């Protein structure tokens, strides 16, 4: 356990739509985060992205103390992985086969790599799967932490997933299924425990979708200026970095 200085906070930041605007991390955002770090606060990225696609550009601009990736399924403090969770092969195979049946673009995620099925390479990850049944034949070493379906699923399909999985996060245009009970809020709890502080010392900043859990859970939830209505309703504060 590491100590956090008295009266300092752990700031958890979504990436896409929060610190990353689609082209990069704005200079004013990077400067604001640098000031927060200089004042003794801890900065954590808390993202739905797998660790392998949290780019060097983003890491260099934010200079985080840690990274929570793939909706809380992996937590790094510096270079140390303090928590990781993976699906059973049965659950991963079920999800990939389900995506194949639905005829949708599927992304299979681990800390080290992404694998695409029924779609193109994603963010430079050139790993592909032609048939769901070949997942663990082609990638026997893969520890799957999250599976994403890259289009909207019908309510009937979502109901099938929710019968088997605790967290099924349906957004506009994609659906995420992380392992177990992992989400951005459970990650905040684990990081706060690591530093020996309560969640009242956590600030969570987000804009949409899978940020809702952490914005509601943290001691202080902050909605970005571009946030969706549900995030703004759940937040304690509105802000624009």
What are these regions (language model features)?
Residues 21-41, 87-91, 128-129, 181-193, ...:
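Short, acidic loop-to-helix structural element flanking the phosphoryl-transfer center
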Residues 60-78, 129-134, 139-143, 232-237:
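Structural recognition of alpha->loop->beta junctions
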Residues 27-122:
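Active-site phosphate-binding/coordination module
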Residues 44, 68, 203-205, 222, ...:
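Hydrophobic/aromatic beta-strand patches that form the interior of the parallel beta-sheet core
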Residues 217, 221-241:
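Asp-based, Mg2+/Mn2+-dependent phosphohydrolase catalytic module
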Residues 7-23, 215:
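Asp-based phosphoryl-transfer active-site loop
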Residues 98, 102-214, 226:
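Conserved acidic, metal-coordinating active-site core of Asp-based
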Residues 17, 49, 206-208:
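Active-site metal-binding loops of divalent metal-dependent hydrolases
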């Amino acid at each position: 356990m590491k100590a956090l200085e008295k009266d300092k906070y752990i700031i958890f930041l979504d990436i896409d739509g929060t610190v990353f605007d689609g082209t990069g991390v704005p200079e004013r955002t990077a400067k604001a985060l640098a000031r927060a770090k200089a004042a003794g606060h801890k900065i954590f990225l808390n993202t739905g992205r797998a660790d392998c696609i949290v780019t060097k550009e983003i890491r260099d601009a934010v200079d985080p103390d840690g990274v929570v990736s793939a909706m809380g399924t992996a937590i790094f403090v510096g270079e140390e992985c303090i928590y990781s969770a993976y699906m059973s092969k049965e659950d991963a195979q079920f999800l990939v086969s389900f995506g194949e049946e639905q005829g949708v673009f599927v992304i299979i995620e681990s800390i080290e790599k992404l694998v695409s099925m029924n779609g193109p390479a994603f963010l430079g990850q050139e790993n592909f799967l032609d048939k769901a049944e070949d997942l663990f034949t082609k990638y026997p070493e893969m520890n799957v932490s999250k599976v994403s379906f890259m289009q909207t699923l019908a309510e009937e399909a979502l109901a099938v997933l929710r019968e088997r999985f605790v967290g099924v996060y349906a957004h506009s245009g994609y659906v995420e299924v992380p392992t177990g009970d992992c989400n951005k809020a459970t990650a905040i709890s684990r990081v706060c425990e690591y530093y020996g502080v309560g969640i009242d010392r956590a600030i969570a900043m987000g804009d949409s979708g899978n940020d809702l859990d952490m914005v509601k859970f943290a001691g202080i939830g902050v909605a970005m200026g571009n946030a969706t209505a549900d995030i703004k309703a759940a937040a304690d504060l509105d802000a624009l970095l």
